[in-house]
Amino acid sequence: ERQFRRWLRASVNKRRLGWLDKGQEWTYWRVPPKILVERQVAEGRALVDMSVRVFDGEAFLLNCALNFKTEASTDAYFWPDGTLVAEQKEATLPAHFAVPASFHRAVRVAERLAQGFDYLRVDFLTDGEALFAGEITCFPASGLGPDDWFMQQMYRRWLDALSLSWALSTPQPWPRRLYLAAFRRWLTARRTELASEPTPVPRRANSD
């Protein structure tokens, strides 16, 4: 028991201090560290990890993953209608993979939860039928994701919904409001700039 307590203390301290590292959610640093023990929901069955990217209540992309966060992890992106995104270069799910029966319910639940937010990623686990709630985050990967096709598309949609963010939708004290006034001017200019550029048309992969 004494050895376990030492290991537990070292593990918790490492995780707690790691929140300030690059690639971590630094905004959580004031949250008191706690241990959360979750009951096992799969009972030996394989689970699909689904994460839904939502802008102001409208789902844009979903990622489905098997064996998530293991060496055997495979994943791919899908549109909210369940078709595979053609633009992705590194889809690794098996060719026979089909979206779970709970896929469309996950979309509806995520859209309802994210209504009124500029951006949320809403995560679920599913055994195919049952749907288990997971993490909800405002900035996946601490906002340090790769500058790929997905990020470029999400960037456009995020700018369109950004006025819903807490900083821009809530009166702010000085001097923060000075910065936000300048940011609003930049946001308007950036939206105008993007509106003059051609928007790539997303493609659906062939079902066969």
Predicted regions mapped to residue ranges:
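C-terminal active-site "lid" helix and adjoining low-complexity regulatory extension at the edge
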Residues: T126-D208
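Amphipathic repeat-derived elements
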Residues: W19-L47, A95-E111, P171-R176, R184-E197
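Generic alpha-helical secondary structure signal
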Residues: R2-R6, A101-H104, R108, W149, ...
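Low-complexity, flexible helical/coil segments
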Residues: K69-T74, E87-S102, R156-L162, S169-R176
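Catalytic cores of PAPS-dependent sulfotransferases
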Residues: A46-L47, S51-N67, E71, S102-Y119, ...
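ER/Golgi luminal nucleotide-sugar-dependent glycosyltransferases, focusing on the catalytic module
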Residues: E1-R15, T70, W79, L84-E87, ...
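Phosphate-binding site of ATP-dependent enzymes
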Residues: R2-E90
